[in-house]
Amino acid sequence: MRRRLTALFFVAAVSAAGAAAVAGARSDKAPAVARIPAIPVAHVSARTDRCPIPARFRGAFVAAANDTNLPLALLTAVAQVESRFEPTATSSAGAHGLLQVMPTTAAELNLSADDPKTNVLAGARYLKRLLDRFGSTDLALAAYNAGPTAVAKRGGAPNSETLTYVGNVNEIWRLLHGCS
């Protein structure tokens, strides 16, 4: 119990720090949101299984990580938050699959959002494009969630939902340190 409380405290501190970094992308301004509540990630734990990708999708994630030179742990964290590894997940906005890729984004990349393998590759390539554009993992994750136009216009995460999203991906990514 004590170990779990310590882990939750650490996750809360990391989430708040990550959210503050995303909110205050420019150091001359105070963060838009000084503090957000951490959302415990009960479905991912710090255990010996450092890379909890379902076996049937592991090859797609490894290939996408190699293709984009993104950390496998980061792609795993995005998939956990986006779909909890449910390949048929569809958002209210129309995003599909493991990495919740919009069909228009997949089409721009000449890939399918519906097939798990190409969905993971499309999501990874899109995240890499955002990372190259914004130069920051936190801003790239915010743009992945809220759209690059909203992040560019705001100079950071445009709303508390996006701050929470970035914090959740970051806390899972940290828990998955060593995932390979």
Which residue stretches match the model-derived regions?
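An acidic, Gly/Ser/Thr/Pro-rich helix-cap/linker signature
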Residues: 1-48, 59
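Catalytic glycan-binding domains that act on GlcNAc-containing polysaccharides
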Residues: 30-180
